[in-house]
Amino acid sequence: MGEFGFIAKIAELFASVDHHGWEAIGDDCTVLPLGDEALVITTDMLIEDVHFLRDKITPEELGRKALSVNLSDVAAMGVRPVATLLSVALPKDAVGEWAERFARVYHALSEEYSVALVGGDTTSSKDGISINVVAIGRGPLSNIKRRSAACVGDVVYVGGELGASARGLKDILEGNEDTPNVAVHRNPQAQVAEGEWLGSRAEVRAMMDLSDGLASDLCHILRASKCGAELYAEQIPAVDGDIESAVAGGEDYKLLFTVKEDAAAELESDFLSHFGRPIYRVGRIVESASYTIRWFNAGVEFSPDWKGFTHF
């Protein structure tokens, strides 16, 4: 069945239940329209020995990561995060100093983004650390970006360089923990300001964040929008030239979005002026009955075996 097949089964099972105004499963967050505004909510888990190795990450790094990955989902909807709920399951050896160090950094990052902690839960664990964060965002309903909004002819963009996190994890597993890529892997940076800014731009159509890798995540937009894509390998901003890590590695937490073709150049210029760094044009949306990606390098089509991360 796989991870996404399981999610589809759950969505189908609950389709008959009254959503009370909430939108159904399918985006980085669910959306509740409230007049001209909207609330968005997302949740994400971090499980020891699945998402992190405790002896390879500090409590501070894990606190930052736990919050950042959820803020990234809110940013991908085009609005500002405003609050979180935090639930933790801790074994005895993580209670006390470890938990306090985790909480201090979670608090510091919350303060940086003006995101309140408004609830949660704590419990003991007999088998490792588990962390669950619920993040809430708020903004104009007109700014909400959905995966289903891409149109044929749109330009595909990513919000920064890709592959550093995957290369950092590889360095850690090889015992080389003092590299720039390791620092990126351990301290992900959500594109919060960028997401809110892109949300305000009508020419930006579909958007999501890159958590499982470009090769996997773009397919979510394609299936939701019922179209295909061409990606140009030579234009992908791959860290250290490692294209496979850039498209299949995951945990980059950069924004992936599509833009109306006739407004793309102006958006690029405005983004550069506003943030002092570029966005990267990596492909375009095309017609496709199979909702798949076609890969090109310098105009020559090829068929790589690049797949993003899945849990099942």
For each of these PLM feature ranges, what is it?
Residues 1-312:
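Helix-biased detector of long, well-ordered alpha-helical tracts
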